[in-house]
Amino acid sequence: MPRSPHPPRRATLASLAAELKVSRTTISNAYNRPDQLSADLRERIFDAAKRLGYPGPDPVARSLRTRKAGAVGLMITEPLDYSFSDPAALDFVAGLAESCEEAGQGLLLVAVGPNRTFEEGSNSVLAAGVDGFVVYSASDDDPYLPVLQQRQLPMVVVDQPKDVPGVSRISIDDRGAMRELAEYVLELGHRDIGLLTMRLGRDWPHGDPRPALADPERVLSPHFHVQRERIHGVYDAMSAAGLDPSSLTVVESYEHLPTSGGAAAEVALEVNPRITALMCTADVLALSAMDHLRSRGIYVPGHMTVTGFDGVRDALRRGLTTVKQPSMEKGRRAGHLLHNPPGSGLPVIDVLETEVVRGRTSGPPA
C-alpha cells in the first residue's frame, strides 16, 4: 500500500483535549497540577497522549508563561576535566544535584574555565536559562561575577569569593581547620615544613604553569580566599609555637593535574632538603606527593609526614592525615538556600563543621 504523501499531524494539547472531550485546562492540569484530577482521569489522559504521540507541554512555552526556567546554574571557573576528576568537587555537585532534584529543578553547568575567551564565557552566563546561580570557588577578581550579577537573579557563593555584597555564602573555617592540623604537625616535632598549595591567582606565576616556589607577595595577597586562609592557618600555628612563618616553604601548583602534587613536592625538597613534613591544601596534592615520594624511596611516615585537606574517600582509604570537610553537605545547603532564601532578605553566611583526621601518614621527624 502506498504511503500517504501527508505525514500524520503531531498531536497537540488542543487535539488531545478534543479527543478526550475535556478542556485544555484539564489536560494541562494532568501534567502541571496532578492533584487537581482523579487518578483515573490522569491515567486516561496519559494513555491517550501516548497513543496519539503527544509529548507533553512545550517546556519553552511553559518557561515563557511562568517566567521560570526550572533549573539552577552552577558556575564553574575550573576546566571541566578537572572539576569532574576532583573528588571534593564531585561530592559538592552530587549534593547540589540532590537538592535541585528535591526542589523539582534541573542543574545546568555554566563553564567559564581558563580555556574560554571572556566573550565565550560571558555569553554562557548571559544565555543560561536558569532561575538562579550557585558560584563554586571563584577568585575574588573573577571577570564573570559582574556579568552574572547583571542577570539580577538569586545567587549563592560556595567557599569563595568572600564578602560579595548581598550574597549568601556556604563555607568552612579554612583558617581554623588548617591551624588545628598544623598544630598537630608541630606537636609531632616538625620544624622544617613545606606547604603545597593549589593556585593562588588566575595568572601563571612567573609566566609558567609548572609548580614553583611562591614569592611572598603572591602568598600574602592571593585572589583565592580559600588558599589564603589555609596558608595563614599554618602561619598562625607557627607563630603560636614561636617559629618564624617566613621559614615555611610554600610551593604553588597552578595546574590541577594528577601529577601536580608530586611535581610540587619535588620543588619543595629542592628548595629545602631539610623538610620533614609536607602539608597540602588539598588531598589530591597530598596523594600525588605520596606517590612521588615512594618512587624516590622516601617512605611515609617513616621519612616524611604528609597531610592533606578535604577528606575525600580515596584519601581516607589510604589513611591520609587530613581535614575532613562536608563537601556534599555544602552542595545540599547551597541548593536549599537558593530555593529557600531567607525571609529577611539579608545574606546568610553558613559555616559548616570540619574534623581533623589523624591518619597513618603522620609521625615524628626521622
From Swiss-Prot:
Keywords: DNA-binding, Repressor, Transcription, Transcription regulation
Disruption phenotype: Deletion mutant has better growth ability in a cholesterol-supplemented medium compared to the wild type. Deletion of the gene alters the composition of the cell wall, leading to its remodeling. It enhances the hydrophobicity and permeability of the cell wall and resistance to ethambutol. Deletion of the gene also inhibits the host innate immune response to M.smegmatis, and promotes the survival of M.smegmatis in macrophages and infected mouse lungs, leading to reduced transcription of TNF-alpha and interleukin-6 (IL-6).
GO MF, one example: DNA-binding transcription factor activity
Database matches in InterPro entries: HTH_LacI, LacI/GalR-like_sensor, Lambda_DNA-bd_dom_sf, Peripla_BP_I
Domain of life: Bacteria
SMART domains per record: HTH_LACI
DNA-binding residues: 13-32
Domain HTH lacI-type intervals: 11-66
Pfam families named among the record's database cross-references: Peripla_BP_3
Role this protein plays: Transcriptional regulator that negatively regulates transcription of the mce4 operon, which is involved in cholesterol transport and utilization. Acts by binding to the promoter region of the mce4 operon.
Protein name: HTH-type transcriptional regulator MSMEG_6044/MSMEI_5883
